[in-house]
Amino acid sequence: MKVAVLGAAGGIGQALALLLKTQLPAGSDLSLYDIAPVTPGVAVDLSHIPTDVTIAGFAGMDPTDALVGADVVLISAGVARKPGMDRSDLFNINAGIIKNLAGKCAEVCPNACIGIITNPVNTTVPIAAEVLKQAGVYDKRKLFGITTLDVIRSETFVSALKGISLADVEVPVIGGHSGVTILPLLSQVKGVEFTAEEVVALTARIQNAGTEVVEAKAGGGSATLSMGQAAARFGLSLVRALQGEKGIVECTYVDGGSEHATFFAQPVLLGKNGVEEVLAYGELSEFETNARDAMLEELKANITLGEEFVAG
């Protein structure tokens, strides 16, 4: 099993690479790519960690060497948020990066599963889809927007608020991966009751948690370490499913035939070909139904923006 991380020299990429080096199954290959010249050095640094994961690093303008033979590609390349920016402000730079890297994946590893971390995910995933379609290699089962950060934040915040073990907390998160398009289904958390006020406050905190980190870092970065952990959780789940492990479910932003939008985040059963089945997300509370319906205009606009970017 070969996993490639594109954007591996950045804050998310290095955290992700560390977690993959220590947690990928024995015998895996881990390939790191970034335009930054430090990237081969990041690989050397990680190579000193005693795990049975082979690692190589590549720098420069062409990621081809990193992508050859890749089964999974995780893309975190791009610029990060700074104070005063929202995820859509990143679009102008990151859209072009994703377009180029998706094109390289289509050319070098057309059968790989691709997980996109680069924001704005609501838009960068449709960009990748359009590029793969143009190349004639699009398989909607193999393209994912990684929204796991919303899930782990939800789990953490619910556990802290209610004083319950994280082992007992599961929070499905549906919709998209920015602002009001992030919808944690708090009504589905087992064994916990929330007041109406708690639901409103907790939903808002989860939706704005990225801004919380950006402001706390005072211009020094965005959520890199928690995002690295979230991407590792998703990537490792995907690897296990590709290797035949059954019953692995993660929430992720996919082209899954949703009645709401072309791309929509919801629970997905992973399998040997990527998405095995897009799962129903169950009954919503009145608050959640209203929030879902209210987000759709923005989510659809984000998707259209990506499609039009590739169409030119």
Swiss-Prot record:
A Pfam family recorded for this sequence: Ldh_1_C
Enzyme class: oxidoreductase
Transmembrane parts of this sequence: none
Keyword flag Oxidoreductase: yes
Active site: 177 (proton acceptor)
UniProt-listed Enzyme Commission number(s): 1.1.1.37
CDD domains the record matches: MDH_glyoxysomal_mitochondrial
GO cellular component terms, A-Z: cytoplasm
Sorted UniProt keywords: NAD, Oxidoreductase, Tricarboxylic acid cycle
Source superkingdom: Bacteria
Residue sites binding NAD(+) per the record: 7-13, 34, 94, 117-119, 227
Gene Ontology BP annotations: malate metabolic process; tricarboxylic acid cycle
Residues binding substrate, per UniProt: 81, 87, 119, 153
pH dependence per the entry: Optimum pH is 9.5-10.0 for malate dehydrogenation, and 7.5-8.0 for oxaloacetate reduction.
GO molecular function: L-malate dehydrogenase (NAD+) activity
Catalytic activity line of the entry: (S)-malate + NAD(+) = oxaloacetate + NADH + H(+)
Influence of temperature on activity: Optimum temperature is 35 degrees Celsius.
InterPro entries: L-lactate/malate_DH, Lactate/malate_DH_C, Lactate/malate_DH_N, Lactate_DH/Glyco_Ohase_4_C, Malate_DH_AS, Malate_DH_type1, Malate_DH_type1_bac, NAD(P)-bd_dom_sf
Matches recorded under HAMAP family: Malate_dehydrog_1
Record note on quaternary structure: Homodimer.
Described function: Catalyzes the reversible oxidation of malate to oxaloacetate.
Protein family according to the UniProt entry: Belongs to the LDH/MDH superfamily. MDH type 1 family.
Protein name from the UniProt record: Malate dehydrogenase
Organism, as annotated: Moritella sp. (strain 5710)
Organism phylogeny: Bacteria, Pseudomonadati, Pseudomonadota, Gammaproteobacteria, Alteromonadales
